[in-house]
Structures are given as C-alpha cells and as structure tokens.
Swiss-Prot record:
Positions of the record's site feature: Transition state stabilizer: 19
Organism of derivation: Streptococcus equi subsp. zooepidemicus (strain MGCS10565)
UniProt name for this protein: Phosphopantetheine adenylyltransferase
Subunit relationships: Homohexamer.
Protein's pathway: Cofactor biosynthesis; coenzyme A biosynthesis; CoA from (R)-pantothenate: step 4/5
Amino acid sequence: MSGKIGLYTGSFDPVTNGHMDMIKRASHLFEHVYVGIFNNPNKQSFFTFELRAQMLREAVCALPNVTVVSAEHGLAVDLARELSVTHLIRGLRNTADFDYEAGLEYFNHRLAPDIETIYLMANHDLQPISSSRIRELIAFRAPITGLVPQAVINQVEKMNENNKKI
C-alpha cells in the first residue's frame, strides 16, 4: 500500500451515501485519497460548484487521509498527474456504469498510461442511489435522510427554510 495515491472524481451534485461508501472504502486501500470535484459539461448543475465542494468537504472531514480538491474544469488525468496520483478510483453500480467507465478508461489510459484505473463495486444496499434521483427528491421536498450525508441534508433544510431555489 505504500505510496499508493487514489483519485475519485465526480460532479457530486449532490454527494450521496453511495459516493461516501466508495470514498471510505478507498481510504482503507490507499495511503491518501483525493476526491476531485468537477463540473460535468454535459449536465446543468443543481447545486452551485461552491456548495457541492462545501458539502463534500463537510462529508469527508472525519477521514484523515482524504482531501477534497476542486477542479472545476479539465480532465481527471490532468489532475491526477498534478497530484502524483497512482490510481483513478471508479465506482460501479451496474452494467451501464461498467460500459460507460470502460470507455473512459480507454481514453484515460491513452492519456496517462502510468495511472491505473481500479473499480469498486457499489455496496448492494446503495446501488439504487444516484445524484439524479436525489435531485428529484429534493425538488419535490421529499425526505432524503439515509440517502445522503448530513451535510447535504443541512444545506437542503437551510435552503427550504429560506424558500430559495437550489
């Protein structure tokens, strides 16, 4: 395990308990784990980039070998090189995720052949959870307890109290 540094990336819009499970498990496999928060150019964000980063930082604060890094734009492999990462960490919930990730891995390997990609299977109980489903629940003010970290719940409650559009 010595010298192994992982990078787990996503838009985390918002961070879910599925993401947190991946981050916690990766923190046991690597000396250090960076969690890179990106904007997805193919999606309209629900939460601002700053709020997503804040909620993610609060969610991982108890994990001493995990650091959140903001990389609003760019490629994960570029951030990985900048941070001297040895492994990209990807989570898989189902075969659709696998097909998508296999395509990404091909290009990541072409751009950075020295950085390995590893896949962690999602915990069975967390497989149905996705940020897009959470956003739907939030939009309808449905309960999200047990699906997301407390930092997300706190932010949603705060915004609901102020009747702000998220």
